[in-house]
C-alpha cells in the first residue's frame, strides 16, 4: 500500500522513497514500476475512449449570455473529471486567444473530452465550448450540430439577458435537451429564486429542475456532471455502418494545413485510410487523429459517437467546408449529413494601411487571420484618398472589433478602419440594365459608391433584424424614444418581473451598426442588454447621398440613407466637413446632393489677403480696382485649382 500511495498520489516522490524500499528484491521493484508505468500510460491509451460504448457518450455544450461564467464552469468540469490539474491559474482554459482572455469572451469554439465515472461505469463527456455573443452565432450553430443537449447557464445576480433568450431558442430549434443552471449563487446580491421564476415565465422551465451552482468556488458543479449523464441522451451514432463524419469547425495550422474538428456519425476512421469530401469530391489520406483533453492526444482511430481532430493534409482552409460530410473512399456514394446554412456577412468595413508601404505586410496578416475565420469575406478595394486596401465583411460589430484587435495584437498592424456599412439588395428594371449586370435581376451592393440610381431600380431592400432588449422598467420611455428614432417597430413586450421588461423590435440593421448599443447602455446606466437575429430584407425608401466639393464628386464620402433621414444626415455631414477641411486660397462649397437636388450646404471661406492695407486715403476708385482684381484672381483660381483635402480629413470622417 505504501508503494501504491507514492505512485498514484504523488508520482514525483518515487525517487525520494526508493531508499525506503531498498529491502525489497530488484524483481519486486521492477514489477511494481512496470505496473505503475502501465497505469500511467493508460491515461493516454486510445482504447479507453474507443471502447466506451455509444450509450455511455454524452456530447454537450454550454450556452450563456456574455460574462455569465461559461468558461469558468468549463474549467471546473475539466478539474472535477481530472482532465486538468486543480490549480489557481486555471482561468478560461478553453479560451486560447489573447482577445478572449482580455475581453472575457469566447470567440472560437473549443472542445475537450472528459472521462467521468458514474455508478460504476465510465462515461465519455465531450464538452464543446461555444461563444456567447450574437456575432459568433455561427460558431454556436456549428457546435450545437454535434451536441445532444446543452447547459443553459444563467447568472443568478443579473438574471435572464437578451442573449440567454437567443441561445435558448437556438437550442430549442435544434430539439436539444436543455439543462438549466443558475451560476454565481455565492454572490451577495444573488437572487436564485427570482431568476428561476424568470426562467419559468419566459421558457416554462420548472424551477425544481434548475440546478444552482457557483462555478468560481466549485459549489454544485459535480451535480452538473451527474445531470448531464442522467438527462442527456447518447448520440445517434452507429458503429456498424460505413464511416461518415460531420465537420463542425476547422482551423489552419501552418505546418499541418487545415485541421478539422469532426463528429463521427457512423463507423470508424483510422490513420492511413482515405476519405472523401462530400462537397468538393476531393480525396484525402488521414494523416493524424486526436482527442482533445483539452490538449491534443494522438489516437489511432475515432469511432462513431466521438468528437475529435482529423488532419488530412488539406492545403488551405477553403478545402475544409464547415457542415461538409466526410466519408470513406471505398463507398461509391455519399449521403450528406444535415449541414449548416452558410453565414452571410452583415456588416462591411474598409481596411487600409496607414502607410501604403505597409500594404504587403497588412495583406499577409489579413490572409493569415482569414484562414482561421472563414466567416470573414475579403475583396480588394481602392480609394484615391486612402490608397489600396480591402473591403471586409463581418458577422457583426463585435466580430469587426475582435478582428481588428487580433490584427493589432498578433501582427502588430494598425490599419485604418472605415465606418461600417451594410449590404443592400436591389431589384433592377429594364432588360438592358439587367443584361449589363450579368442577367441578374437582383444584385447586392455593400459599397455606397456603387449604389445604382433610382431610374435603374424597381425596388430597394435593406436588411432588418429582430432585436431583443431587456432593461429596467423605469428606462422604458427613453428606450422607446431611441428605438423610434432608429426607425424600429415594436413587436412584443413582456414583464419579466416587477423590475424588468423584455421588448422586441423590428429594426433596420443600418440603424444599429454604429452607436445603438452605446446609446442604449447610456440611457439605461449600463443595465440594458441587447441581442438581435437576422430577419431578412425588407423593401425600403433608400437614397444615395453624394458629397460635392465645388461641384466635384467625392466617391469616398458617398452614403446610403433612408429618405426620411436624408436632410438631417446631410446637415450633420456637411457641418463636420466644414470643421475638418482646412481653409484654402479658394472658397469651398460643401454640398450634399440627393437625386440631383442639393439638400444641405456649407461654405468654407477662403484665405483673403488685405490688398487695401497699403492705401492711406485718396481716391476710392483705387480701392475698388484692387478689390476687383483680387476677386477676378480668386475666380480664375477657383476654376483651375484642385481642392486639397488632407488624408487625415477623410480618416476622421470615415473612421469608426
UniProtKB/Swiss-Prot annotation:
Q: Which reaction does it catalyse?
A: GTP + H2O = GDP + phosphate + H(+)
Residues in tr-type G domain copies:
55-236
**What's in the keyword line of the UniProt record?**
GTP-binding, Hydrolase, Membrane, Mitochondrion, Mitochondrion inner membrane, Nucleotide-binding, Transit peptide
Cross-referenced CDD domains, in alphabetical order? EF4_II, EF4_III, LepA, lepA_C
Lineage top rank: taxon: Eukaryota
Task: Extract the coiled-coil ranges from the record.
Answer: none
Task: Identify the GO cellular component terms for this protein.
Answer: mitochondrial inner membrane; mitochondrial matrix
- According to the UniProt entry, what is the EC number of this protein? 3.6.5.-
Which is a GO BP term held by this UniProt record? positive regulation of translation
Q: Where located?
A: Mitochondrion inner membrane
Q: How does it sit in the membrane?
A: Peripheral membrane protein
Top EC class, one word: hydrolase
Entry keyword annotation includes Ribosomal protein: no
Q: Which InterPro entries match?
A: EF-4, EFG_III/V, EFG_V-like, G_TR_CS, LepA_C_sf, LepA_CTD, LepA_IV, P-loop_NTPase
GO MF term set = GTP binding; GTPase activity; mitochondrial ribosome binding
Residues reported to bind GTP: 64-71, 129-133, 183-186
Summarize the protein's role. Answer: Promotes mitochondrial protein synthesis. May act as a fidelity factor of the translation reaction, by catalyzing a one-codon backward translocation of tRNAs on improperly translocated ribosomes. Binds to mitochondrial ribosomes in a GTP-dependent manner.
- Other notes: This protein may be expected to contain an N-terminal transit peptide but none has been predicted.
Entry-linked PANTHER family: TRANSLATION FACTOR GUF1, MITOCHONDRIAL, TRANSLATION FACTOR GUF1-RELATED
Sorted alphabetically, which HAMAP family does this protein's record hold?
Answer: LepA
Family according to the record:
Belongs to the TRAFAC class translation factor GTPase superfamily. Classic translation factor GTPase family. LepA subfamily.
Name of the protein this chain belongs to: Translation factor GUF1 homolog, mitochondrial
| Upper lineage | Eukaryota, Metazoa, Ecdysozoa, Arthropoda, Hexapoda
